Amino acid sequence: MTARNVLTSPTRAAECGAICAVAGQSQRGMREWAEAYPRLFAPKPFDAALYSTLSLAMAFSGPWFTAGQLRMANKATLWAFGLDWLVDYVATSPREAEDIARRCLEVAEGGSPLPGDDLTRMLADIRDELGASPAFPVLGPVWRAELRRMLEAMLRETRWKAAKAGPTFEEYLDNADNLGFSFVFFSHWLYVAGPDVADPATVAEAGRAVQRVIRLLNDLGTYERDVTWGDLNVLLLGVPRAEVERRLAGLAARSRELIAPLRAGSPELAGYLERQMDFCAGFYQVGDYWGGL
């Protein structure tokens, strides 16, 4: 199909319209969460475009899902952005970041959130919603493990930044859990799954492969912001852009290989993973989710 046909196809336009309508419903939910947990979402970085683009990312990645089915994908994503903001920009030392991680892990294990702590209060609400899923006996422990992996990766990055000693390219890729994609993906899967689920280890391998792809796509697309905000970025580690792009192509191909076996038994999971990767490939060529400092 030519570009002209794509742009003028009424079927494709109708599909995009339906997807955008779901995203609009989801965006309203995000704004309600931002109002419910006001200490977590500073107005400048969490601007209107952030809520809009995040909800569009989820809707286009799973166009077969309703806004209700995408509720947890959106809620966990927004929470992870709030966590990232606190760890990367609000915390003034690795010790403060470690305290944030400790509080989150305690709540994930069933503890009560601290009074006035919107981060753990929102996490407790996420935990309780997920606890009602029929898949929780199987995927609940995996969800907690994914949260721990994300927090540990975030803390590792804070230590790198504090020591002013950047990691190697391989160490950086191995730390891609700090992106939060796998945590959000498992939150979504747990929320929509029934009692019979695919093998978590197989799904996790595919999800982490996609996460590494999105990590590099993010870095290539947000280099200027990362320089301004003082973030780590693979291009700031002395890795040439051409080398990053070459590695990215290989990682994307490997991701598709790992996704392929999931299609027979879990077509929605497989499709969601691949579409997330492809959505980000287009999105980061043009924009970024964050607002301003």
Could you describe each region identified by the protein language model?
Residues 1-293:
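Alpha-helical, largely C-terminal catalytic domains
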